[in-house]
Every structure is written in C-alpha cells, then in structure tokens.
Amino acid sequence: MQKLAVYVYIYLFMLISVDPVALDDGSQPTENAEKDGLCNACTWRQNTKSSRIEAIKIQILSKLRLEQAPNISRDVIKQLLPKAPPLQELIDQYDVQRDDSSDGSLEDDDYHATTETIITMPTESDFLVQMEGKPKCCFFKFSSKIQYNKVVKAQLWIYLRQVQKPTTVFVQILRLIKPMKDGTRYTGIRSLKLDIDPGAGFGQSIDVKTVLQNWLKQPESNLGIEIKAFDENGRDLAVTFPGPGEDGLNPFLEVRVTDTPKRSRRDFGLDCDEHSTESRCCRYPLTVDFEAFGWDWIIAPKRYKANYCFGECEFVFLQKYPHTHLVHQANPRGSAGPCCTPTKMSPINMLYFNGKEQIIYGKIPAMVVDRCGCS
C-alpha cells in the first residue's frame, strides 16, 4: 500500500514538473491540423461546386430533350427575337427565381421540362401554297409538346407599319384550305377595324385558339394563313416578310398550355455561406451564369441561383429516413453511411430557343437546391 502511494506521488510530481513550453509546442500540431482541415474543406467545396455546374449543364440539355446546345449566334438571335409585347413582358417581368424556403415543401416534378408558353415563328411549308400567283404568309409548324397538353390560349401577333397620319386599317386573317370546286382557297378567321395614330408601328394580337385546336386535331388541314391589313388607299401595312430595319417584326404565334400541379411534402435543413465553418450537411450558395458558358440560346434568365449541398453526415444527423440509423446499428460494417444530398428542389422558368429556332417559355424541374439533408 505504501509503495502504491509513493508511485502516485512520483506521478503527480512529474505532471507538475512538465515544462510549460513543451505543452505549448505540443498544441501546435493540433492548430495546424485544424487549419489544414479548413483548407481541405474549402478545396472539397470548390470541387463540389464545379461538379454541380457541369451536372446542371447536362441536366438542362437532357430535360429540354436537346442532344447538344443549339448553335444560335447573337446576331441570329437579334433577327429572330420578336419585338412584341408578350415576349417583352416575359423578359422585363421575368421571375428569374424565387429563393423562398419558408414553405418547406418539395415538388415531385417530372424529370423533363414543363412547357408553359411556346412562341412559334413562321416557317416554310412542306408544300407550296399560292394565292394570286405568289406565296403568302404564314405557315406554322407546331411542337409535339402542344399536342399533348391542354391549350389555354393561342394568339396570333401581327405588326403593322407606321403611318404618317391617323389611319383606319382593315385587318383580315384568312385560313388557307384545299381548293374547292368553286375555286375558293381560303376561309375567314377574323376581321377587325383598327384606328392607328401616326408614329411608331403597331402590334396587334388575334385570338386563334379554335383554329389551332382544329389544326391539332387534323394536322393535314394546316395549310397556313394569309394576313391582310389595308388602309383607305389600299396600301398593305401588314409586315409579313420583314424588309430592311424590320428585324423581329415577323408574325408569330403565342401558345400557352397548362399542366397539373404536383403534390408536396415537408422537409428541413441547414443554410450556410462560403465563409461558414459548419462541418455538417448544409446548403451553400451557387450562381450559374449561362453567358459564361456561351449559351446565348437561353434568353432568360442569364443567370440563376442553383445552390449545392456539402458537409458530413453522421448516422444520427438530419437523416431523411429514420430506418437508416436502424440499419446501421444492426449491421454497421455492411451499410454505407448517409450522404449529404438535396432533399428539396424547385424548378426554374426559362425562356429559350430550341433546335428548331422556336422560342419556348417553360418550367425546368429540380434545378434549384432549397434544402439539404442526409439520406
């Protein structure tokens, strides 16, 4: 017993006699290790960001059913982009992205993009339709997306040349049909009288929903339309084949479709910034810049907040499924650890040119990370 007491005293004396400098030196590797850990975390986050951006590029093309990015230059876009109210409203009032995480819901989106608005420019017909010896405007080809969705609106937009004095213009929209026995080759869609003030040109929309629905039911009946807009002197003011200085004034169709809303569920997670020292699974900010990719075919948004997930996942931290922890407890060696992944994602609206030089306004699902968690 006395020997044991002696050993205890000697041990305590050695602890008290330890050089304090030695203790300080011993703590230095710990500080260095912490700094190295922070640097490694920054590097890993940067790699995660780069991977996320590349994945986004692939996802956008895939969800839009594009094999590759449309090769449309800025000069071509300037010529094709209609100068009309509906498109300008989409650009000016464009809801780039709502980063509202207060609702805590998760949309069960389909994988592919949901189309909301399609702007179709006139194109060459598969067959030559002539009236009075010359080709007439306009023929429209329709995306397959329109045929499988409910059409809620279809507007034909036309542009009238400017006048020098107050003028009354008589507008006729005619639908071309196969020649009848009496020689008739068209039927009326709409007639209207417009009073135009002098100055800039004038844009006018005409409801063609019924005509479009008939074309979709019977594609062979789509032979095109003719646009007439004469003033009192018989001068045609309709811009059907734009001349010099009339780029973007082509007639076009604005078609809006609707889709069934998706169900949602609740979820929660952590938010961090780039200077955060949080080691747990967290959502970090990430802005995707399409102009930096050279993707001029995307009209809007030019950039959006995509965000990404990064961090460690312990088996008891923010697990998406409760049984994950139970499986690990039952077989800790045979089960992989949970990963930090998105648990809530939301769509973005996008205005873009497709491969056929049509302007599409649609919703691309699961492009914004709203919540991160371990699962």
Curated annotation (Swiss-Prot):
SUPFAM superfamilies: Cystine-knot cytokines. GO terms for molecular function: cytokine activity; growth factor activity. Glycans are attached at residue 71. It comes from the Eukaryota. Keywords: Cleavage on pair of basic residues, Cytokine, Disulfide bond, Glycoprotein, Growth factor, Secreted, Signal. It is found in: Secreted. GO terms for cellular component: extracellular space. Residues 24-266 form a propeptide. Residues 1-23 form the signal peptide. Disulfide bonds join 272-282, 281-340, 309-372, 313-374. GO terms for biological process: muscle cell proliferation; negative regulation of myoblast proliferation; negative regulation of satellite cell differentiation; negative regulation of skeletal muscle satellite cell proliferation. Coiled coil: none annotated. InterPro entries: Cystine-knot_cytokine, TGF-b_C, TGF-b_propeptide, TGF-beta-rel, TGFb_CS. Homodimer; disulfide-linked. Belongs to the TGF-beta family. PANTHER family: GROWTH_DIFFERENTIATION FACTOR 8 (PTHR11848:SF150), TGF-BETA FAMILY (PTHR11848). Acts specifically as a negative regulator of skeletal muscle growth. This is Growth/differentiation factor 8. It comes from Anser anser anser (Western greylag goose).
